[in-house]
Amino acid sequence: QCIRTEQGEDPCTLYQLLSDDDGNPVAEVSVFRLPEGGRAAAGATVIVPLETLLTEQLRIAVDGGQGKLYPFSFCNPIGCYSRIGLTASDVEAFKRGAVARISIVPFPAPDQTVTLDMSLSGFTAGFDKVSVLNN
């Protein structure tokens, strides 16, 4: 997904719309590269529905692994945002993996977990082409 600009190169991110088992869109994920030399090799923005239980955080697990928890940054009328820093080893896991499972907990049903599958097919080729974003 690219943003058109008047001048220079259009910044692009890897984008995936995640749907539930019934085909309803539930979450959006955008992944981008970060400048070299920082603790994070890449960044990701995950947008989930309002009424997500924010204190339970967002979990991302690749190919059935334990996964990592990430806090939510803010909510607006569109949804709740988690802005994530991915380490070089996280990026390598995405490149080697087949599926990243993203899990959230709904506020109205705190005893349940909603798990969405993010395909990692083509991640390596796509990641190598996305823009380096400075923010």
Give residue spans per PLM region.
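A generic "folded-domain core" signal
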Residues: 1-135
